[in-house]
Amino acid sequence: MKTAICSLLICIFLLQLMVPVNTDGTLESIVEQKVKELLAHRDNCPSTVTKTLSCTSVKATGRLASCPPGMAVTGCACGYACGSWDIRDGTTCHCQCAVMDWATARCCQLS
């Protein structure tokens, strides 16, 4: 009987902890208010930095395709449906299949 009463009291206590409490200063309401304030004043803080992402594809015969200077590989494609490739030095695609007729590197530059 004592364990049943203790269990009941523990359950009631836990249920009280789960009941939502309305407070003006919850973290969610504070964050929401700050976001609204920032969005309302975003015209006062124009960005002075503009970046452009320019990309191109470089296709080569064989296993390797290299990007032009200043560009980095963001993806590779290989002939004969080869899906096994790696990027060497951040600028070259290397197709790893045994027989390979072409390789393509997707090269991008942030300027």
Swiss-Prot record:
UniProt record similarity statement: Belongs to the resistin/FIZZ family.
Signal peptide range: 1-23
Alphabetized Pfam families for the sequence: Resistin (PF06954)
Superkingdom of origin organism: Eukaryota
Gene: Retnlg
Keyword Cytoplasm in annotation: no
Disulphide bond pairs: 55-108, 67-107, 76-93, 78-95, 82-97
Any Gene Ontology CC annotation: extracellular space
CDD domains: RELM (cd16333)
Tissue specificity of this protein: Highly expressed in bone marrow, spleen and white blood cells. Also detected at low levels in thymus, lung, trachea, white adipose tissue, nasal respiratory epithelium, colon, small intestine, kidney, liver, and heart.
Major location (coarse): secreted
A molecular function GO annotation: hormone activity
Protein name (database record): Resistin-like gamma
InterPro entries reported in the protein's UniProt record: RELM (IPR009714), Resistin-like_sf (IPR036262)
Oligomeric and partner information: Homodimer. Heterodimer with RETNLB.
Role: Probable hormone. Promotes chemotaxis in myeloid cells.
Keywords noted in UniProt: Disulfide bond, Hormone, Secreted, Signal
Native organism: Rattus norvegicus (Rat)
Localization per record: Secreted
